[in-house]
From Swiss-Prot:
InterPro entries: DNA_methylase_N6_adenine_CS (IPR002052), HemK-like (IPR004556), N5-glutamine_MTase (IPR050320), PrmC_N (IPR040758), RF_methyltr_PrmC (IPR019874), SAM-dependent_MTases_sf (IPR029063), Small_mtfrase_dom (IPR007848). Substrate binds at N186, P187, P188, Y189. It comes from Coxiella burnetii (strain RSA 493 / Nine Mile phase I). It catalyses: L-glutaminyl-[peptide chain release factor] + S-adenosyl-L-methionine = N(5)-methyl-L-glutaminyl-[peptide chain release factor] + S-adenosyl-L-homocysteine + H(+). It comes from the Bacteria. The lineage of its organism: Bacteria, Pseudomonadati, Pseudomonadota, Gammaproteobacteria, Legionellales. Belongs to the protein N5-glutamine methyltransferase family. PrmC subfamily. This is Release factor glutamine methyltransferase. Keywords: Methyltransferase, S-adenosyl-L-methionine, Transferase.
């Protein structure tokens, strides 16, 4: 038999080679297997795992040792205030993507009935985070992957979010209307031959890679979005840390104004905001 304390220590040691947060990973796996909170793990470290629990835990650890992200093993990832279902059909939501949500909530009029579009919604993270905070707004989300849309719809249903609609297709072309107050997106932006892709091999490549310069999807969105925004509407795009200057040039060439670069807590350029002229 193995206690929670012993299991946490053993797993943490095993995962040091594949994880920057081995102890947290160990605790999350134990939470999942034992169906207990982290507070319970700390409060009752002497509790013993039965043979079935040990077998399941061992299988999870083996998957993690092969580099599979903890979110896929658990089948869920927290984003904003939401616990979202995730599978290898969708990109794992990142904390830095919350910048898109924060900007929208802070800068658009709270009490008006606005229409927002989310392009390449994946798990629905951005669309659902905005929808849950602004239940009187209408959010239309698109994705070219039917499998991803299925996950997004499951997440919407799980959180009883009624003001978010999902559409299958490429970027803006899948949208049902052309009068959005803001369009947001976290499109693929990694160059096809970037070595970083190897570290992300478990996630859907089509949600990560975008041509030789990583800008193929962003170029399409910048050009298309003008026709789907109201005059003065906003376009927000997450991008790679070294792409800001090129994206700003693309936006200027397409007639956008009030173009600003937003940086993350590390001071890296992460998001471009622009307004339709």
């Amino acid at each position: 038999m193995l206690s929670i304390k012993e299991a946490t220590k053993n797993i943490s040691q095993q995962l040091t080679t594949v994880s920057k947060t081995p102890r947290l990973d160990a605790e999350l796996l134990l939470e999942c297997v034992l169906k207990k909170s982290r507070a319970d793990l700390f409060a009752y470290p002497e509790i013993q795992l039965n043979s079935s629990q040990q077998k399941t835990l061992s299988a999870y650890v083996k998957r993690r040792l092969k580099g599979e992200p903890i979110a896929y093993i658990l089948g869920q990832k927290e984003f904003w205030s939401l616990n979202l279902k995730v599978t290898p059909d969708v990109l794992i939501p990142r904390p830095e993507t919350e910048m898109l949500v924060e900007w929208i909530l802070k800068n658009l009029p709270k009490d008006e009935k606005l229409r927002i579009a989310d392009l390449g919604t994946g798990s629905g993270a951005v669309a659902l985070a905005i929808a849950v905070e602004r239940p009187h707004w209408t959010i239309d989300a698109t994705d070219n992957s039917q499998a991803a849309l299925k996950i997004a719809e499951i997440n919407a249903k799980q959180h009883e979010i009624k003001n978010c609609n999902f559409y299958h297709g490429e970027w803006c072309q899948a949208l049902p209307r052309r009068d959005y107050h803001a369009i947001v997106g976290n499109p693929p932006y990694i160059p096809d031959k970037d070595q970083h892709l190897q570290q992300l091999k478990h996630e859907p490549r089509e949600a990560l890679a975008a041509g030789s310069d990583g800008l193929s999807a962003i170029k399409i969105i910048i050009h298309e979005a003008k026709s789907y925004l109201v005059n003065g509407g906003w376009l927000l795009l997450e991008h790679g840390y070294d792409q800001a200057e090129k994206i700003m040039t693309l936006m200027q060439a397409d007639g956008y104004r009030e173009i600003t670069d937003r940086r993350d807590l590390a001071g890296l350029s992460r998001m471009m905001v622009a307004r339709r002229g």
